[in-house]
Amino acid sequence: MSAFTPASEVLLRHSDDFEQSRILFAGDLQDDLPARLDTAASRAHTQQFHHWQVLSRQMGDNARFSLVATVDDVADCDTLIYYWPKNKPEAQFQLMNLLSLLPVGTDIFVVGENRSGVRSAEQMLADYAPLNKVDSARRCGLYFGRLEKQPVFDADKFWGEYSVDGLTVKTLPSVFSRDGLDVGSQLLLSTLTPHTKGKVLDVGCGAGVLSVAFARHSPKIRLTLCDVSAPAVEASRATLAANCVEGEVFASNVFSEVKGRFDMIISNPPFHDGMQTSLDAAQTLIRGAVRHLNSGGELRIVANAFLPYPDVLDETFGFHEVIAQTGRFKVYRAIMTRQAKKG
């Protein structure tokens, strides 16, 4: 998070305007501008654990991570700077939450890349904080308005669900596979062997569909699920509960909060972080897996066929297998043996 994003660079063109402001930063916080911008006071709220990790090192308790912001998270703020995400329902969840807490009269800035759909902020906030475009640069738009009316926010109304082969999947905005089981996960599930036993870690669990599907035909597995996303963590907990499956679910930046070793690690790792393409999480997953697998344990991941994971798998484990593939996806398996680097 050292370099500033285009959205932050647009904000820096107006840095003098923020020196006397008490600012709440929220949304898709891809850099550490909230910790570095000269303001009267700064807070940050994020639903992304890895963004909170970076910001909390510099901002301490003024950086908060949770699904839903609370009154304490916005205390004494007179300005909101919201970074528009690529997911419109995610923006609606977060903005309705934040605007329901901030006092009338709060200055509202919304910034984002044009390709993210930031211009739809005008329509979304029209009844609460009418926005005007005040700058356009770096293929981004910056919008300003003042909060005239607080919306009513009910997080429960944002929940959704769908069924997959008799399983109930609970979802929230921004959670991967929110609208149905993706093709990659289907391919990975097709490779899982019934009656598997042992400890299984699902990294980047999303809505928890991989874990509950695995548990249905392998009820003796002991599940641990983690994700960087607060909505994903809550969705996975709800999915497990809806299907009467037990498991531990928590927020983690890949393995940052994971303790112990497992017999299998499964994942459909992301290769985007917000609007940006990033292979960091998947490469961290592969390289770090050797520190969290028992001897003979297995890493099994699905990925777009064009992504350069075979080299990292071979470098880390000494070898890998492709156990299923389509034109778009491959399922990779690597076994923890003496050949594997011990991290």
Swiss-Prot record:
Record function comment: Specifically methylates the guanine in position 1207 of 16S rRNA in the 30S particle.
CDD domains from the UniProt entry: AdoMet_MTases
GO molecular function: 16S rRNA (guanine(1207)-N(2))-methyltransferase activity; nucleic acid binding
Family: Belongs to the methyltransferase superfamily. RsmC family.
Reaction catalyzed: guanosine(1207) in 16S rRNA + S-adenosyl-L-methionine = N(2)-methylguanosine(1207) in 16S rRNA + S-adenosyl-L-homocysteine + H(+)
Enzyme Commission number(s) of this protein: 2.1.1.172
GO cellular component terms given for this protein: cytoplasm
Descriptive protein name: Ribosomal RNA small subunit methyltransferase C
Keywords: Cytoplasm, Methyltransferase, rRNA processing, S-adenosyl-L-methionine, Transferase
Compartments, as annotated in UniProt: Cytoplasm
InterPro entries associated with the record: DNA_methylase_N6_adenine_CS, Mtase_sm_N, rRNA_ssu_MeTfrase_C, RsmC/RlmG, SAM-dependent_MTases_sf, Small_mtfrase_dom
Predominant subcellular localization, coarse grouping: cytoplasm
Binding partners and assembly: Monomer.
Stored Pfam families: MTS, MTS_N
